[in-house]
Amino acid sequence: MGLSVVILAAGKGSRMNSNKPKVLQTLAAKTLIEHVVSSVEKLNPDNIVVVTGHLKEQVEDALQGRNITFVYQQQQLGTGHAVLQALPYLKEQKVLILYGDVPLISTEVLENLVDTTNDDDLGVLTAFVENPQGLGRIVRDKFGAVTEIVEEKDANDIQRQIKEINTGIYCVHKNLLQKWLPEIKANNVQKEYYLTDIITFAKADHVSINVTHPINEFEILGVNDRTQLASLERVWQRNVAEKIMAKGVSIADPNRFDVRGNLDVGKDCWIDINVIIKGNVKLGNNVVIGANCILKNCIIEDNVRIKSNSMVDGSIIREGAIVGPFARVRPECDVKEGAVIGNFVEAKKTILGKGSKASHLTYLGDSEIGANCNIGAGVITCNYDGVNKHKTVIGDYAFIGSDSQLIAPVNIGQGATVGAGSTIVKDVPADNLVISRARQRHIDTWQRSVKKTDK
């Protein structure tokens, strides 16, 4: 059974007060239309047609690389007119029609609509809502059959009391669209060609109208302004949080937790408030994430503690390691088992060996640090000469004293000790003590300068 999909994305979205089309506003770090496209792609349709209008180039760029046909609606003359523009690009099969600004629609709901609609039926997705203001109402006859869809602007007082609304999502064979779309008239307040008129044509042609409903009301909610966008963001995040908690993870406050990508979790993890997940993140078992942390494209293994106000990006934190508080782990780091990246430590493209510690106020860049090393406070690996980056290698069991600078490229041998306050420019052999600082002098005849005072 073949399927074509039409996504309507021509609207400007004036209430967004934005320089980009409404469908390119973001929810959970993805554009609204990307959410919709992702849902319909799982249906494996033969083709997807996106009808563009306002700033069409931006929409096409956002969906670049996907198997989509773009059709330009030069004049925004309504939903019926928009689908008419797509008609020549559709195959002789069922057509699923939906909107690019309804981001939470699920594949399951769409699949149910498609599967229950026969080739000679009209499938309509409707929903019952508490506040139908601004939405088209489903009008039924005394037998309960759908007779028409009335837009709010055209509805009378009785029709405005109806709670069942049109979601704007339909499934209908192309043959029926070819017959009905040219018959739509713009005889309404807006002077637009409403796709909803196909309900009337279906009744006149004795076409069966198949009505299905969404699993959750939020799935059919559209976005017209930034307030609605923020509301749907919280709905999305709450839904994600509940799925994560069902897998055995405790979240301190689901209302203060954001996933802007994909999170794979183990069991018995604890996630504190204001944690943000970006890209693809994997948590092992018994992981603790402190407040205000940001995790992006990283792997966190079992029994790791990420303390508050820390960032981990593009790196792997091995079992039992500790990061933070106030630490930043930049891309291409490998923090080995039991290692510590402490408070106000920044690491970039660095291997920190098993059991090694950089507990505070340190920069580790382009470094390879062995096991069981101690990196003192204020240590800096000076990796950049203004043109190129250079590597610092520190052997197992080395001790780097506080406030030392390691001028790369440089090697510190296994078991070597660097005295505090040293600037190291040459390799240090294994088990050596190296001190590079001025000798301390005492001058007992020195007098401090005294400021002149007004007489």
UniProtKB/Swiss-Prot annotation:
Cofactor: Mg(2+)
Keyword line: Acyltransferase, Cell shape, Cell wall biogenesis/degradation, Cytoplasm, Magnesium, Metal-binding, Multifunctional enzyme, Nucleotidyltransferase, Peptidoglycan synthesis, Repeat, Transferase
Binding-site residues, Mg(2+): 101, 224
Region of interest called Linker, as start-end residue ranges on this chain: 227-247
Disulfide bonds: none
Enzyme Commission (EC) number: 2.7.7.23, 2.3.1.157
NCBIfam families: glmU (TIGR01173)
Name this protein carries in UniProt: Bifunctional protein GlmU
Keyword field contains Cytoplasm: yes
Superkingdom in the source lineage: Bacteria
Pathway in which the depicted protein is active: Nucleotide-sugar biosynthesis; UDP-N-acetyl-alpha-D-glucosamine biosynthesis; N-acetyl-alpha-D-glucosamine 1-phosphate from alpha-D-glucosamine 6-phosphate (route II): step 2/2; Nucleotide-sugar biosynthesis; UDP-N-acetyl-alpha-D-glucosamine biosynthesis; UDP-N-acetyl-alpha-D-glucosamine from N-acetyl-alpha-D-glucosamine 1-phosphate: step 1/1; Bacterial outer membrane biogenesis; LPS lipid A biosynthesis
Subunit annotation: Homotrimer.
GO molecular function: glucosamine-1-phosphate N-acetyltransferase activity; magnesium ion binding; UDP-N-acetylglucosamine diphosphorylase activity
Any single GO BP term: UDP-N-acetylglucosamine biosynthetic process
Cofactor note: Binds 1 Mg(2+) ion per subunit.
Location of region: N-acetyltransferase: 248-455
Location of region: Pyrophosphorylase: 1-226
Residues involved in acetyl-CoA binding: 377, 383-384, 402, 420, 437
UniProt cross-references to CDD domains, sorted A to Z: GT2_GlmU_N_bac, LbH_GlmU_C
HAMAP family cross-referenced by the UniProt entry: GlmU
Reactions the enzyme catalyzes: alpha-D-glucosamine 1-phosphate + acetyl-CoA = N-acetyl-alpha-D-glucosamine 1-phosphate + CoA + H(+); N-acetyl-alpha-D-glucosamine 1-phosphate + UTP + H(+) = UDP-N-acetyl-alpha-D-glucosamine + diphosphate
InterPro entries for the chain: Bifunctional_GlmU (IPR005882), GlmU-like (IPR050065), GlmU_C_LbH (IPR038009), Hexapep (IPR001451), Hexapep_transf_CS (IPR018357), MobA-like_NTP_Trfase (IPR025877), Nucleotide-diphossugar_trans (IPR029044), Trimer_LpxA-like_sf (IPR011004)
Active site (UniProt): 360
UniProt subcellular location: Cytoplasm
Protein purpose: Catalyzes the last two sequential reactions in the de novo biosynthetic pathway for UDP-N-acetylglucosamine (UDP-GlcNAc). The C-terminal domain catalyzes the transfer of acetyl group from acetyl coenzyme A to glucosamine-1-phosphate (GlcN-1-P) to produce N-acetylglucosamine-1-phosphate (GlcNAc-1-P), which is converted into UDP-GlcNAc by the transfer of uridine 5-monophosphate (from uridine 5-triphosphate), a reaction catalyzed by the N-terminal domain.
